[in-house]
Amino acid sequence: MNKNKPFIVVIVGPTASGKTELSIELAKRINGEIISGDSMQVYKHMNIGTAKVTPEEMDGIPHHLIDILNPDDTFSAYEFKRLAEDLITDITNRGKVPIIAGGTGLYIQSLIYNYELEDETVTPAQLSIVKQKLSALEHLDNQQLHDYLAQFDAVSAENIHPNNRQRGLRAIEYYLKTKKLLSNRKKVQQFTENYDTLLLGIEMSRKTLYSRINKRVDIMLDHGLFREVQQLVEQGYESCQSMQAIGYKELIPVINGQMIYEDAVNDLKQHSRQYAKRQMTWFKNKMSVHWLDKENMSLQMMLDEITTQIK
């Protein structure tokens, strides 16, 4: 261990890989507290669709960055990094081990490495204005949208192909939110870790993972996911950014009579599998992870290996 830096354990992996169970059992072994590294579990009232850990599952282990915002609030990597850094300091000062567990790659990466992020947080009123302006651009074709971007950020326009509409919209959205140019954004990864980090990941075959994801979606639906989404819509949260998350956006058309339930469930499973694939690509390409093979290691075997590395 590097005594000059706070020691943290980070557990990553795709959705439905078992991060929650492993992190809780590890916390029991090493006197740890858990910081959620999930961009959606910060929201209240969004429990089933985010696979949020229940009080029973916590089993007395303190969890942080869960249920801290309303669904109409915004949350960013900048906010996560700021809050997580404060929590790590507090947990460490109390003689315990911070365990960050989650699947939001950018959040984890921004915390571990020396990322400088700008605050993109906006108020609900500001976000509404930004959405209105973006909606007004929907009628533009790709080239017209690219020309619009070039009017205020020529550098980004030069680096983004006109057919890459998503990246173009991202640059425009960034400008509308911050009044700054995405091309000037200071976001530097220096590959010097802020912490003495034990970075672990849970992996398994794609076939096994996809089977677990499909089963988890069925369990979520059995536990009342549809009703959860329905209640959020009834409370006026339908147009919120948080409701674009997988598990929520697929069921809204059913509630509005625009899609049949079975098709929405199929979309939900497909989107979840695609998201898991993107997560694994991120972790394997952008982070130096020590992988634990869930198919060939029991929970106890994984815990034994982790505690051996800590010693």
UniProtKB/Swiss-Prot annotation:
The residues the record assigns to binding ATP are 13-20
Its Gene Ontology molecular function terms? ATP binding; tRNA dimethylallyltransferase activity
Biological process (GO) annotations held by this record are:
tRNA modification
Q: Provide the catalytic activity annotation.
A: adenosine(37) in tRNA + dimethylallyl diphosphate = N(6)-dimethylallyladenosine(37) in tRNA + diphosphate
**Which cofactors are reported in the record for this sequence?**
Mg(2+)
Pfam families in the record: IPPT
| Key words of the record | ATP-binding, Magnesium, Nucleotide-binding, Transferase, tRNA processing
| This protein's record includes keyword Nucleotide-binding | yes
- Record-annotated membrane-spanning stretches: none
* Broad enzyme group: transferase
Q: Which Gene3D superfamilies match?
A: 1.10.20.140, P-loop containing nucleotide triphosphate hydrolases
**Which InterPro entries does the entry link to?**
Dimethylallyltransferase, IPT, P-loop_NTPase
- Record site feature (Interaction with substrate tRNA), residues: 104
Under SUPFAM superfamilies, the record lists: P-loop containing nucleoside triphosphate hydrolases (SSF52540)
Q: What does this protein do?
A: Catalyzes the transfer of a dimethylallyl group onto the adenine at position 37 in tRNAs that read codons beginning with uridine, leading to the formation of N6-(dimethylallyl)adenosine (i(6)A).
Name of the molecule in the record? tRNA dimethylallyltransferase
- Source organism per entry reads Staphylococcus aureus (strain MSSA476)
Identify the gene encoding this protein.
miaA
